[in-house]
């Protein structure tokens, strides 16, 4: 599965869950993914979303993609990793 296939599959789910902004980072963004690679996604929700909403989003993304998905919010990126992650991120929304 390439990054364009991932985008096509996840955009409707992201919109359904109230995501305002999203990017893919990590091995898929660098085109270095392996069969065992997870998919790393950054999201920014609209107002009023909780940790439970993040868990629901992660679960639905994993169901559709058939792979493990790590979902982070832009605000939760560790400061020491932030520049590297944002530089390699590929925008989805």
Swiss-Prot record:
Binding site for Mg(2+) 2: 38, 40
Keyword Phosphoprotein: no
Superkingdom: Archaea
Pfam families: NTP_transf_2
Cofactors that this protein relies on: Mg(2+)
Enzyme nomenclature, EC number: 2.7.7.108
InterPro entries assigned to the protein according to its UniProt record, in alphabetical order: NT_sf, Polymerase_NTP_transf_dom, Type-VII_TA_antitoxin
UniProtKB keywords: ATP-binding, Magnesium, Metal-binding, Nucleotide-binding, Nucleotidyltransferase, Toxin-antitoxin system, Transferase
Positions that bind Mg(2+) 1: 38, 40, 70
Catalytic activity, as annotated: L-tyrosyl-[protein] + ATP = O-(5'-adenylyl)-L-tyrosyl-[protein] + diphosphate; O-(5'-adenylyl)-L-tyrosyl-[protein] + ATP = O-[5'-(adenylyl-(5'->3')-adenylyl)]-L-tyrosyl-[protein] + diphosphate
Cofactor note: Binds 2 Mg(2+) ions.
Motif residue range(s): GSX(10)DXD motif: 26-40
GO MF annotation terms: ATP binding; metal ion binding; nucleotidyltransferase activity
EC class (word): transferase
Assembly and binders: Probably forms a complex with cognate toxin MJ0434.
Biological function: Probable antitoxin component of a putative type VII toxin-antitoxin (TA) system. Neutralizes cognate toxic MJ0434 by di-AMPylation.
Family, per entry: Belongs to the MntA antitoxin family.
Name of the protein in question: Putative protein adenylyltransferase MJ0435
The organism's taxonomic lineage, starting at the top: Archaea, Methanobacteriati, Methanobacteriota, Methanomada group, Methanococci
